[in-house]
Amino acid sequence: MEVIPFESLTLTDEQFLAGSEDGKRVTIAGELRLPRSGTDRLPAVILLHPSGGIGGQIADWEQWFLSLGVATFVVDSFTSRGIENTINDQSQLGRLAQTEDAYRALSLISKNPHVDASRVMLMGFSRGGQDTLYASMVRFQKAHADASTPGFAAYVPLYPDCSAHYLDDDNVSQAPIRIFHGSADNYDPVAPCKAYVERLKAKGADVELTEFAGVNHIFDARAFAHPTSLPKAQTVRNCAWEERSAGHLLNVKSNLPFSYADPCVERGVTIGYDESATEQTKKAIANLVTTTLKPTPTRAP
């Protein structure tokens, strides 16, 4: 394992949406793990953590991808910014900050001699899932991504929040987008994602949403073997926001700039592991990896 520091920016949502690169510079880090030694260039997946930071579920996914012959790069978007987690206070970091981190991570590892820049996938969870989803937007790529490197080969958001409606958000990458969500998710409900997917499909995007009946948020985290209540966790499940002019997010109900102090922002969610949903998600992602990243499986010693 190699810890690799790299420079990113801490941007407000307004700055990010306006295409600004004038945010506060920050050196964050990622952990690169390779499935095997050697000199060949490997496919890779960049992983964006949820509001709780890097936990056991990320380690599980790392080991799983490594077993498929895929290198992993886990981006820590919190530590260098002085954040432990954003569960109870999402205002600590812009909602699109991890998208900026993802683009910069892609630029970084694309230059790594062990990584094939044309075979890098982006995967994220909850907060990291929404940033994975919107990283597919062509508008954001033109404004913030490194034009000298290939784009992501695929996007895999797990239980993202889809309540925001950005300008040109139906113009996305031609790469596959595969979303996995639970019907019982009361943290980031699936309904807005279903509506967004329909808009994307109408524009010809290669997007699919897999919905698991009765499944909660964070369904892939074994640490939450039983449904767990987080009474203070902030959720925007009853909010809808819209970017009506570049850089300005408005609460659809009030027509005022969105704030986490808005009445629609509530507290109290349930999270919980679901083995069946996790295994079905792995099976689908394994198929995606085979078709898009084309790894050489790691052989057991």
Regions inferred by a protein language model and the residue ranges of each:
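N-terminal cap/lid segment of alpha/beta-hydrolase-fold proteins
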Residues: 1-40
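Short substrate-entry loop that stabilizes the transition state in hydrolases
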Residues: 38-42, 47-84, 164-165, 184-190
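Alpha/beta-hydrolase fold active-site loops
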Residues: 43, 153, 176
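Cap/lid segment of the alpha/beta-hydrolase catalytic domain
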Residues: 52-59, 63-67, 77-97, 135-143, ...
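Short alpha-helix in the alpha/beta-hydrolase fold that links the catalytic acid
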Residues: 60, 189-199, 224
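Primarily recognizes the serine-hydrolase "nucleophile elbow" in alpha/beta-hydrolase
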Residues: 94-173, 184-187, 191
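Catalytic His-Asp charge-relay segment
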Residues: 174-181, 185, 208-210
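C-terminal catalytic histidine-bearing segment of alpha/beta-hydrolase fold enzymes
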Residues: 206-301
